[in-house]
Amino acid sequence: GVVPSKASFSMHSILVNHFLRGAWYPKGGAGEIAFHTIPVIRKAGGNVLGNAPVQRILLDSQGKACGVSVKKGQGLVNIFAPVIISDAGIFNTYERLLPAEARALPEIQSQLRMATHGEGGFTVFVGLNGSREELGLEPTNYFIYAGDDLDEIMNRYLASSREEAAKNIPLLFVTCPSAKDPTWETRHPGKSTLAIVTFAKYEWFEEWKDKQVSKRGDDYEELKKTFVDTIMQAVFKLYPRIEDRIEYISGGTPLTNQHYIASPRGEIYGIDHNIARLQAEAIATVRAQTAVPNLYLTGQDLCLGGFVGALQGALICGSAVLKRNLYADVARLKKRTQATDSKK
């Protein structure tokens, strides 16, 4: 999520190595991850609550985390537990969910000083009338750049006014989820989807942050439409057959991310994973264990951005909570699975 001059070589190497081995996609779409995870949680005695946003982390008289307060309708419900794990991100966890006295702890302030917000994201979701074959879509991720000096084009873009930026977007990530899913055509014959992502500054949309979702006014919608139109003109060059086959299109700004996934400034990869974040001191400081007893961090902010980065954060956090090396468990599981497969 950063320009090359601010990117860690080691992190980039991990990413390249990941894709050199081939990518993967869950059959049935991303929702299958939650669908198959929830029963495991419930089987272990846990539960999963929807429409129950956490309002604050509860501390006991000794300053230890002992539960969370969640919103239910117009009221609040306190849920108590011996261990509290937060995947809300460093800024949300420390600045929004913890009481002031815990937030003021030197260790927490030290972590906050080392963290910076990642850049906001702008996403376009497209529904298409036509199959993958009819529209020439591919199970491929495309990165489209407006030039070969990525630092220069991105810095100029992020320094420009919102009106200028909306017409001159230098970087796009284009993916076709429906083409990647081998079950898609059976479930949704003759239909396809695209998702396009780029970066956008939170400040470009900040004046509408207090407006109600879907009621932010004509100026906001016009700015959003300009971004969408510019993005789609580039996508039409990649997939020309889709231009007159669009049935649905929706743009999401940093405010959209702020509303639906509670990212403080519309960021999609959590905190900024730049070189400073990956220095030894920062890695040693931002750990799963927090200065508040019984409170742990997990997810992107603990490790790296993206799904696999968040998954690594979960393994690190789980190891800390259980006081057990889960990476060793995974290695043993892999070895056992390979041995079983070889006998088939």
Which stretches of residues belong to each language-model region?
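A conserved FAD-binding loop/helix module that cradles the flavin
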Residues: 300-322
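Beta-rich nucleic-acid/ligand-interaction surfaces
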Residues: 47, 52-66, 70, 251-264
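Active-site-proximal substrate-binding core of FAD-dependent oxidoreductases
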Residues: 59, 63, 323-344
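C-terminal segments that line or cap access tunnels to active or ligand-binding sites in enzymes
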Residues: 129-252
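Mid-domain catalytic core of redox enzymes
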Residues: 25, 55-187
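Hydrophobic, well-ordered secondary-structure elements that form the walls
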Residues: 85, 126, 196, 235, ...
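Active-site/ligand-binding neighborhood in enzyme catalytic cores
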Residues: 1-44, 51, 259-277
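A glycine-rich dinucleotide-binding beta-alpha-beta segment and adjacent secondary-structure elements
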Residues: 1-4, 169-175, 237-304
